[in-house]
């Protein structure tokens, strides 16, 4: 079967390249925005609230519409949705670079998120269409590694562009590459043969978007507004009520947007839980590590971005191995093994200090990359293998939704935890090391004496010495807080191990397959 499939799909690696191109570009643009934000602020006089909405403008349409876009791919064709999404994303990216006000930046960022949501879930099925069943895991592993590569290239290449050119070039520079990707997609990609019912559940979609939008805003605004503020509590209430309304509509409509029967599938449900926990830990970790490198170790933004290369390098090299293991042994074993390695890697970060050299950090990042490489594609295989092909698009949309929400929850909760633990450790250390303690007096006297020898007045020298002591306390409190939160990310990954044990591998069917085109044999899997 593999041989015949290969004969029918001679362009399978070209398809993988084309789909990976769009995925890399979206990850690159999304991650490089952090580098450009301060420059955008200066150009348009952004307030911090404007900056938050620049981020949310992408996250809300992307996260809230993933299942809808997957469903539309099932209904109207996955190639159509992929190409249309890439066109929308490219045009919006170009317009962000040409923006003339803060409002237009936010508006075009919304279209960016919408375009990414259109092509991402459908990209998975296009890769699956191009490869025979015994190679799909490996192919999706490679695709997933390139998806992660885009996220790491943003802070590095994007950092150089922002520093030596300008922030507008960050967005406009990808347009020619994306245009080539659009043309190649139209010429090479094949449309999916299976198109489901054209009926669209608009009411269910409305409630789903309302629920997820409220949740994303609440998670990202909660720390600033206060988790118990009327605004945030109201958003959480809206989230719950909209979700209940969505479940009610979906359980009673003949053509639901998300077939709730999917969650009767224990393996699909378990894989979604693992995906949620994995991205909660992963996004939390990737949020913390660059901040640790910059704020604690004093790395420049570009150096901090380049420092993540061992992570992406190990992922790219080993992702095909994770896919091969999934093809041969099923998704459960490599998923559990990968989550175990990921948990160990995240836990090892808690021992870092302000004196940690780069080599030990690089080794930790490599271990983290190995864990992710073994987890991602096998987990996607496990999530999607038992779903009927006509529900593959919406299934991959739901799977990506769980990962996306998990990532948002992880950043919000772990970011808040970091602030709380830093306050806690600052208080403890300040009580222990105060101006009246013997240790503090000895330190202050030493610093003060050195400053006086250099010609500083006694009172001024004391103020500088005291400020230095407070800075040391604050830095050590921050190091300890980072350590606590890294342990929390490891615990989340460990919970993923438990959920992974609930996955049941599906035995591959033997020659009961009808003699149809390979595109009809798709068992799509995916990774974000």
Segments predicted by a language model, with ranges:
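Small-residue-rich alpha-helical segments with characteristic i,i+4
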Residues: 153, 159, 361-445, 488
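Transmembrane core module of solute transporters
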Residues: 12-66, 104, 146, 165-166, ...
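Cytoplasmic loop-to-transmembrane helix junctions
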Residues: 50, 135-142, 391-398
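Symmetry-related core transmembrane helices of the 12-TM Major Facilitator Superfamily/SLC fold
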Residues: 171-186, 235-239, 484-501
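Helix-loop junctions on the cytosolic side of multi-pass membrane transporters
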Residues: 183-202, 248-257, 424, 502-511
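Helix-loop-helix hairpins in multi-pass membrane proteins, especially solute transporters
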Residues: 66-204, 230-231
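Hydrophobic transmembrane architecture of multi-pass small-molecule transporters
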Residues: 405-505, 510-528
């Amino acid at each position: 079967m593999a041989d015949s499939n290969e004969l029918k799909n001679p362009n399978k690696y070209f398809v993988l390249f084309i789909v990976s191109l769009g995925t890399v570009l979206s990850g690159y643009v999304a991650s490089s925005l952090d580098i450009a934000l301060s420059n955008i602020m200066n150009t348009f006089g952004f307030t911090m609230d404007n900056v938050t909405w620049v981020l949310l403008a992408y996250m809300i349409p992307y996260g809230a519409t993933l299942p809808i876009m997957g469903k539309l791919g099932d209904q109207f064709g996955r190639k159509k949705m992929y190409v249309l999404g890439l066109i929308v994303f490219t045009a919006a990216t170009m317009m962000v670079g040409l923006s003339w006000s803060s409002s237009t930046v936010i508006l075009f960022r919304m279209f960016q998120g919408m375009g990414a949501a259109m092509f991402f879930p459908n990209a998975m099925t296009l890769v699956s269409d191009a490869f025979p069943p015994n190679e799909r895991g490996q192919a999706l592993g490679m695709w997933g590694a390139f998806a992660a590569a885009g996220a790491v290239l943003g802070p590095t290449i994007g950092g150089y562009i922002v520093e030596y050119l300008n922030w507008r070039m960050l967005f406009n520079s990808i347009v020619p590459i994306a245009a080539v990707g659009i043309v190649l997609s139209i010429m090479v990609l094949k449309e999916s043969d299976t198109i489901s019912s054209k009926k669209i559940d608009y009411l269910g979609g409305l409630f789903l978007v309302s629920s997820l939008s409220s949740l994303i805003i609440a998670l990202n605004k909660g720390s600033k507004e206060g988790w118990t503020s009327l605004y945030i509590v109201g958003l959480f209430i809206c989230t719950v009520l909209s979700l209940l309304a969505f479940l009610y509509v979906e359980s009673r409509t003949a053509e639901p947007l998300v077939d709730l029967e999917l969650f009767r599938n224990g393996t699909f449900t378990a894989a979604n839980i693992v995906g949620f926990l994995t991205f909660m830990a992963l996004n939390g970790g990737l949020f913390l590590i660059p901040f640790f490198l910059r704020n604690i170790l004093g790395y420049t933004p570009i150096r901090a971005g380049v420092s993540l290369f061992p992570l992406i390098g190990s992922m790219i090299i080993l992702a095909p191995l994770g896919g091969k293991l999934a093809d041969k042994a099923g998704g459960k074993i490599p998923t559990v093994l990968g989550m175990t390695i990921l948990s160990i890697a995240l836990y090892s970060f808690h021992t870092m200090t302000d004196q940690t050299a780069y080599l030990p950090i690089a080794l930790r990042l490599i271990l983290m990359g190995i864990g992710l490489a073994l987890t991602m594609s096998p987990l996607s295989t496990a999530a999607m293998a038992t779903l009927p092909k006509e529900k593959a698009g919406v299934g991959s949309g739901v799977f990506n939704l769980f990962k996306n929400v998990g990532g948002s929850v992880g950043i919000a909760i772990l970011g808040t935890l970091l602030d709380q633990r830093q306050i806690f450790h600052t208080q403890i250390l300040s009580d222990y090391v105060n101006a009246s303690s013997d240790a503090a007096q000895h330190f202050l006297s030493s610093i003060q004496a050195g400053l006086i020898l250099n010609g500083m007045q006694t009172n001024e020298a004391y103020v500088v010495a005291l400020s230095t002591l407070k800075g040391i306390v604050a830095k050590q409190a921050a190091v300890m807080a980072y350590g606590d939160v890294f342990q929390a990310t490891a615990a989340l990954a460990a919970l993923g191990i438990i959920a992974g044990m609930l996955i049941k591998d599906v035995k591959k069917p033997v020659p009961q397959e009808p003699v149809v085109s390979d595109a009809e044999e798709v068992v799509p899997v995916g990774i974000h």
